[in-house]
Amino acid sequence: MNNLKRVVVIGSGFAGLSAACVLAKEGYKVTVLEKNSQPGGRASVWETDGFKFDMGPSWYWMPDVFENFFALFGKKPSDYYNLKRLDPGYRIYYGKDDLMDVPAAMALMEEMFESIEPGSSAHLREFLAQAEYKYKVGMGEYVFRPSHSITEFIDWNLIKKSFSMQLLTSLRKHVRQHFKNPKLVKLLEFPVLFLGATPQNTPAMYSMMNYADLALGTWYPMGGMNEIVKAMVKLAEELGVTINLDTEVTKIEVENNKVSNIITDKETLQADFVIAGADYQHVDQKLLDEPYRNYTDKYWDSRTMSPSSLLFFVGINKKLNSIEHHNLFFDEDFEQHAKEIYTNPQWPSKPLFYVACTSKTDDTVAPAEGENIFFLIPLAPGLNDDDATREQYFDMVINRFEHITGESIKDNIVVKRSYAMNDFKADYHSFKGNAYGLANTLAQTAFFKPAMRNKHIKNLLYTGQLTVPGPGVPPALISGQIAAKEAIKMLS
């Protein structure tokens, strides 16, 4: 019966591929439409002159989410790619000759905390025990709810557990109740950068990210993050999914409150159901006529977006000894940078930045005597983006990188590419050029997020980082599963 039912998935990011796989396993005929020339959405890859760069996500956290996804199909991540746990997980530079390596082993982590703030190892155990509880409740009972309405959360067992989730306490306050040393505070507040809000505006529930970071660890799929995309594409094709690349959806036509036609720049398709994994705002405002939109322009403009980013992909013809795979440069004032992202949006005066050098772990991503370096500066979304400004910031981060690490790279650059707001918009129709979707503030959590269901169209659902559960690769995998299960219910 299901073989007769056709589902079109718009977008081949993690959420779209996840939804496609779940639907295909249930016997639906699934076609994925992808506007770009490679699948994976933001997790695309750029290869040039022997260098290979992941252009989007670079952190592999929450390995259990990937294991659980592949287990739905009787598979394991190791059937498709080789995972390596990084040790140290990452390095933080607080200034010149002032760094912290974050160890994989918990005993060494406790030793490090104790050496920085005497007595803090006991606080760390207590803090991580609370974070583990939040992670297990959040990832087990909250995250798979489609959040159509508050009634899904009116469950006495869940309400009792919610009191321990610290929804109304800020992460900033929660961290400072346990730790005083500024270095430890920065270490524990850093993961919320992935959630797109400041620690004072992020619920303490999200200390679950500290459990993901410090206890579950930082991993790397050999070959790069795009290996996950390749794995999901292979799985999808094994399940019978058709993926059409270089195919952009230009219009969704509706008749009798159902999608009648999906018009692309190549052809017109019909489907029994549509799951939109492309940028939600773009689908809502650009692909649908006004009567069928979930939201107004005013609504979208009032959303708090997570940051965008200015990225630089740099290949050099020398080896580096004094950096790790993941490196965070916290040598400037976090508060000032946060204000310039969230309070008074502007190009930052002295930004924090992040550097990935995957060739430290993986010799397949750069020539033998070279390194591939990825620089990321978090920015307010919607800023004016031009080449002159990009160059100014490139010079700034290269100078600071060289000063702090003691490594000279300026004269060894053989490959360079920048990527920022205009590129996010052009490649992904990204609203305001955002990189990470909606900020995970309390007012944009669960049923306060843009709805997964279209209110006016019976056979259209949304998935991805602008709806539930939120930004990040593991949440996108989960979002696709939720959308697929909802679609199956609605099609039954």
Question: PLM features: what roles do these ranges have?
Answer:
Residues 250-366:
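Mid-domain catalytic core of redox enzymes
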Residues 57, 467-487:
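A conserved FAD-binding loop/helix module that cradles the flavin
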Residues 95-201:
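Rossmann-like flavin
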Residues 254, 489-492:
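Active-site-proximal substrate-binding core of FAD-dependent oxidoreductases
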Residues 317-422:
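C-terminal segments that line or cap access tunnels to active or ligand-binding sites in enzymes
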Residues 181-195, 350-354, 407-469:
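A glycine-rich dinucleotide-binding beta-alpha-beta segment and adjacent secondary-structure elements
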Residues 208-259:
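Helical element adjacent to the flavin cofactor pocket in flavoenzyme catalytic cores
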